[in-house]
């Protein structure tokens, strides 16, 4: 529901290493002196690749934004080791076949030689991974208006591709939380309204998916695991599925939204088997019409004590695990990621073994780097050290207009 400005992942530089921690980057044999070529930079060439990541054995296509002068060379590095070098003879585009070792990251350096000095004119990284979940770099899209044509979405995804974004979340793309499709399985609406009563064009959603897949990205549709709108009963959602603030099922729990929006969101029990079956059928409708690669599951963090229809207190954390298990069973070939809002339910989410990586939305009470360190440590334990972590990073509007500096662009 929030405007996520960037979704920052476990870092690509983790891939840019050898598995043995070697520190012999540039040194020669013991006691010898290695001749070092001076290096400087003049980063005047913008580079791009044709994909966000490459499976072992796939060829990389590089493109420069302008014709390169004669004598331009490119070398490929794995940390300090040069694993390949060649002249660029085709003006603006060339290909490279990386080593087939899985889960490695490389730096391509475009350079020219001047008076014995290597002048680097452009750089770009290459991720070679059979599974993008190993090094997830998560972006998002949130505007599905008429203007999102095939040409426009291709341009936007080219920008994300340049940042090596390999997963993309579709924020608030759906019609209703309990009925994601605009229309029905057999008859889609050309245009429908999202939760904020903004127009969503079905063609725009499809344009984004197609553009992302051209770059090898994974497309993930967003939805709560337990949301229903005010008209849910007409769509088959039962009263007995809801979460209540009292044991006598008088007051439903809800997430209240601004006036003028489509509806408040009323919460159902994510562990309710009938609800799980219902929503998985709706998800099946989604997959039948859109080439999504998986489901970005959301929650709302810690709630007060809640009860099911029978007056029994509900353990939401365990309910999330049950929901994930049922969702994976219904669509075993689709990816799952679930938001652990302020760590809530992170252990239960990770211990299912059914999510592709951890996703943590961190709020003001966990604003220090020590908090991020603690989350990374906990997620390592919960995921048996097999899953990486993505943090949802929100724009600091007080600093947004200030330019900063960063390392050599990759």
What is the role of each PLM region?
Residues 36-131:
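Beta-strand-enriched, solvent-exposed domains that form extended recognition/catalytic surfaces
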Residues 174-205, 233-270, 301-318:
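Aromatic- and acidic-residue-enriched carbohydrate-binding clefts of CAZyme catalytic domains
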Residues 130-136, 142-150, 221-290:
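Active-site-adjacent "subsite" loops/lids of carbohydrate-active enzymes
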Residues 13-42:
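Bacterial Sec-dependent N-terminal signal peptides
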Residues 121-176:
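An acidic-aromatic substrate-binding cleft motif
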Residues 2-7:
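Sec-dependent signal peptide recognition
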């Amino acid at each position: 529901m929030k405007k996520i400005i960037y979704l920052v992942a476990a870092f690509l530089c983790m891939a840019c290493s050898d598995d043995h921690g070697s520190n012999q980057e540039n040194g020669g044999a013991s006691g010898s002196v290695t001749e070092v070529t001076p290096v400087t930079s003049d980063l005047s060439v913008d580079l791009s690749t044709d994909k966000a990541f490459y499976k072992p054995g796939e060829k990389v296509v590089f493109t420069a934004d302008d014709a390169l002068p004669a004598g331009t060379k490119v070398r490929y590095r794995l940390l300090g080791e040069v694993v390949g070098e060649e002249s660029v003879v085709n003006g603006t585009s060339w290909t490279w076949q990386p080593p087939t070792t899985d889960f490695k990251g490389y730096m391509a350096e475009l350079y020219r030689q001047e008076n014995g000095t290597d002048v680097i004119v452009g750089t770009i990284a290459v991720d070679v991974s059979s599974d993008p979940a190993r090094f997830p770099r998560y972006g998002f899209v949130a505007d599905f208006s008429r203007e999102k044509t095939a040409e426009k979405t291709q341009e936007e995804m080219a920008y994300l591709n340049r940042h090596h974004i390999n997963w993309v979340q579709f924020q608030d793309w759906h019609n209703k939380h309990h009925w994601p499709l605009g229309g029905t399985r057999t008859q889609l609406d050309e245009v429908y309204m999202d939760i904020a009563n903004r127009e969503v064009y079905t063609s725009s959603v499809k344009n984004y998916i197609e553009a992302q897949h051209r770059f090898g990205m994974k497309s993930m549709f967003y939805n709560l695991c337990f949301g229903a709108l005010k008209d849910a009963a007409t769509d088959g959602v039962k009263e007995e599925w809801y979460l209540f603030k009292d044991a006598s099922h008088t007051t439903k729990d809800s997430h209240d939204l601004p006036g003028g929006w489509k509806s408040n969101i009323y919460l159902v029990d994510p562990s309710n088997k009938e609800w799980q079956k219902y929503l998985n059928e709706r998800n099946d409708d989604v997959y039948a019409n859109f080439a999504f690669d998986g489901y970005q599951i959301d929650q709302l963090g810690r709630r007060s004590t809640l009860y099911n229809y029978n007056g029994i207190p509900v353990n939401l954390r365990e309910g999330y695990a049950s929901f994930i298990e049922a969702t994976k069973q219904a669509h075993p070939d689709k990816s799952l990621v679930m938001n652990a809002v302020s760590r809530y339910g992170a252990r239960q989410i990770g211990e299912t073994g059914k999510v592709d990586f951890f996703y943590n939305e961190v709020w003001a009470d966990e604003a220090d780097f020590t908090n991020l360190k603690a989350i990374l440590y906990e997620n390592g334990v919960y995921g048996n050290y097999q899953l990486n972590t993505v943090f949802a990073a929100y724009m600091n509007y007080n600093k947004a207009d200030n330019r900063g500096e960063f390392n050599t662009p990759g």
